[in-house]
């Protein structure tokens, strides 16, 4: 009887890569079209949010349907924990922004002060986590030198 070892891929599945970068670009666009002061385009902001919601549901399903690369350890337990919490936070706040956005949309922009405030505060938290995520990617790429950024790009 032989036991086979299931290895983890070295990089993310191409569909996961497309979803990741599509969501990045759409989030940038959503921020550009946001604004309560009349400077934004709420219709376009809402449409983009709906597309991001659909892509995030697919992306989340992909995490279970397709093998993921092994966690990229820094060799430091504390930094690895921060990395895991950052990824959890990115998913949590992305979905909280989307869910509160859907609530606000379904109520015609009217409704709970809490939902609007949580939508805005989630954006703020998300910006901080995005900055941390980008900083960590550069840390891995240029200090740890583990080609982490190559995992979230297409094979050359």
What are these regions (language model features)?
Residues 1-156:
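Membrane-embedded alpha-helical bundles that constitute the cytochrome b-like, heme-associated redox core
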